[in-house]
């Protein structure tokens, strides 16, 4: 199973909890060290995005806030808040499953990860996955029909 498929499993966990279905995994040296999914509604926190929760878990597991050499796999393009956390945690590479035309901050609506005024560079890999899009489309279609 690919790392993006693992992130998708996390997205489906979020969907089961009626959370926006976004999942994330952090990989170091070819092994998953943290997994998370959106929990904003569950935790009543605007900060409980999958990426933020995965970064927090990974930092605790390795005992350092610096996640240099780690890679993040996420089903939806990170927002500005999450892009900022990615930069601050020094994640080396982000693999993105689908675009977010409204709030994506990794090249779609904005490009925070490689902004010329920031002293950082995060490699971005667009790994379009139809299922990453489909889970979001289906989730919002179901919400509108209720």
Model regions and ranges:
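Residues that line or immediately flank small-molecule/substrate-binding pockets and catalytic motifs
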Residues: 40, 74, 98
